[in-house]
């Protein structure tokens, strides 16, 4: 009963956050995405200091955007990478940028469990999960929140993945 109540509380919190995000006015500033990623990576490593995780973070990737909202995006993407690599002996999580159709495209890449691309269109729906809750915890609201924040910034997000080979999330702003 306690576990179910905790899960319900987490779900309600996530839904409230999703609702707030869709109503939030942007407060854009020039920010260093790499610094935000470094802070989140440090926090993740402190949460499980015995995990063998290598972070590769391209330095000084500057953008104009809402710092609070982009922190939510990066925290969700990096937490997912952390979660879905938890069964790896050696984990690699990368953050960087690449040229993609004349846009600045940022990415978060991991070497985790990945997923079947046939289900990629379900990734960003509320309550959509590609793995069972017994395998990996979560509410199924995080990526929906991420997509809405990216859209508010005028960008888009998509993923490439292969089962057993990891996932890369790409986004533009």
Task: Give the predicted meaning of each segment.
Residues 3-8:
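Short alpha-helical segment of the dimerization/phosphotransfer core of two-component systems
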Residues 154-160:
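Glycine-rich ATP-binding loops of the HATPase_c
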Residues 90-102:
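Short beta-strand/loop element within the Bergerat-fold HATPase_c
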Residues 1, 142, 146:
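Short alpha-helical Gxxx[C/S/T] motif in the catalytic ATP-binding
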Residues 27-42, 94-97:
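A conserved beta-strand-to-alpha-helix junction within the catalytic ATP-binding
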Residues 115-127:
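Short conserved segment of the HATPase_c
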Residues 29, 49-62, 98:
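Conserved catalytic submotifs in the C-terminal HATPase_c
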């Amino acid at each position: 009963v306690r576990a179910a109540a905790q899960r319900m509380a987490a779900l309600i919190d996530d839904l409230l956050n999703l609702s707030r995000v869709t109503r939030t006015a942007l407060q854009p500033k020039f920010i260093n995405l790499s610094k935000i990623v470094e802070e989140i990576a440090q926090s993740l490593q402190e949460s499980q200091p015995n995990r063998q995780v290598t972070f590769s973070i391209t330095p000084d990737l500057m953008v104009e955007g809402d710092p609070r909202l982009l922190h939510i995006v990066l925290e969700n993407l990096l937490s997912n990478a952390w979660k879905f690599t938890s069964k790896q002996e050696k984990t690699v999580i990368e953050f960087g940028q690449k040229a993609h159709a004349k846009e600045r495209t940022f990415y978060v890449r991991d070497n985790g469990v990945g997923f079947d691309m046939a289900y990629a269109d379900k990734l960003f729906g509320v309550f959509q999960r590609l793995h069972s809750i017994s395998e990996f915890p979560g509410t199924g609201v995080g990526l929906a929140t991420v997509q809405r924040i990216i859209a508010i910034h005028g960008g888009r997000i998509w993923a490439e993945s292969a089962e057993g080979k990891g996932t890369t999330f790409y986004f533009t702003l």
